[in-house]
Amino acid sequence: MANLNKRPDWIKVKAPNSTEYYNTKDLIKNLRLNTVCEEAACPNIGECWSKKHTTVMILGSVCTRACRFCNVKTGRPDLLDPYEPQRLAEAVQKLNLKHVVITSVDRDDLEDGGASHFAECISEIRKSSPNTTIEILTPDFLRKEGAAEIIANAKPDVFNHNVETVPSLYKTIRPGARYYNSLSLLHNIKKLSPEIFTKSGMMVGLGEEINEVVQVIDDLREAKVDFLTIGQYLQPTKNHAEVAKYVTPEEFKYLERVAKTKGFLMVSASPLTRSSYHADEDFQKLKENYQQKLMS
């Protein structure tokens, strides 16, 4: 039996130590912004921050959910910061970002789940950096009527919402969420604003069966999702769900081949794939693939 306490070689990454990494870290700290890169202990932080790529986390740093895979703090959330959209826009300008990814904690305590705050952030960035493309990675807005409409009207270039895992594991891994609500949100955004690229991702290695992963792939395509990401689950701390399996690079290639036959514009499946990993480059490829599809 494999030793799951020891990560295989294909998971290991170099510790961050570049000048660019520390410059990005200092700027984020000075502007008092949160990032999912730090809060979720992303393994790709060194590479991304060295390239001045970062995923900013809005709506505070405390989540109202307690998902078993996530390293973000949970509890009573912070008060909304009305100046956060302006500070975020300033950071985008100072980092000279061509593409920015904005995510957030879940805010079940807010009437719209934080949708209008996302919209304000998009608006502020459009004012100061009109050429920057904007990708948002949102919560599920469970039971938040009108939230999808607010997001669709804000017109991000990419709308991302992760289903995270297969339906059979929701009760233990993602207990505060509903699988079909997530699918519905993705489909609704596409129906409300067909020009917005939609994206979703999931983790493997939590104990799911391969046929369950394929079913999720089918469900996401049925919801008109354009871009699919699949990555290895890594246990953030001993208090989180344990890794059931380290999926091999060959198995990821198989899943990628299967997904590509379903009609997605883009698929990224590898051990270190994360929702926002290489988001800038992937957005360019996404647009190119869309144009090629129109011409075919």
UniProtKB/Swiss-Prot annotation:
GO MF, one annotated term: 4 iron, 4 sulfur cluster binding
Main localisation: cytoplasm
Protein origin, superkingdom: Bacteria
Membrane-crossing segments per the record: none
Residues annotated to bind [4Fe-4S] cluster 2: 63, 67, 70
InterPro entries: Aldolase_TIM, Elp3/MiaA/NifB-like_rSAM, LIAS_N, Lipoyl_synth, rSAM
Keyword Metal-binding listed: yes
Cofactor: [4Fe-4S] cluster
Record keywords: 4Fe-4S, Cytoplasm, Iron, Iron-sulfur, Metal-binding, S-adenosyl-L-methionine, Transferase
Family annotation (Pfam families): LIAS_N (PF16881), Radical_SAM (PF04055)
Signal sequence segment: none
Domain spans labelled Radical SAM core: 49-265
Residues at which [4Fe-4S] cluster 1 binds: 37, 42, 48, 276
Known pathway: Protein modification; protein lipoylation via endogenous pathway; protein N(6)-(lipoyl)lysine from octanoyl-[acyl-carrier-protein]: step 2/2
Enzyme Commission number(s) of this protein: 2.8.1.8
Cofactor note: Binds 2 [4Fe-4S] clusters per subunit. One cluster is coordinated with 3 cysteines and an exchangeable S-adenosyl-L-methionine.
Class in the EC hierarchy, top level: transferase
GO cellular component: cytoplasm
SMART domains: Elp3
Catalytic activity: [[Fe-S] cluster scaffold protein carrying a second [4Fe-4S](2+) cluster] + N(6)-octanoyl-L-lysyl-[protein] + 2 oxidized [2Fe-2S]-[ferredoxin] + 2 S-adenosyl-L-methionine + 4 H(+) = [[Fe-S] cluster scaffold protein] + N(6)-[(R)-dihydrolipoyl]-L-lysyl-[protein] + 4 Fe(3+) + 2 hydrogen sulfide + 2 5'-deoxyadenosine + 2 L-methionine + 2 reduced [2Fe-2S]-[ferredoxin]
Subcellular location: Cytoplasm
Family (UniProt): Belongs to the radical SAM superfamily. Lipoyl synthase family.
Protein name: Lipoyl synthase
Source organism of the structure: Rickettsia africae (strain ESF-5)
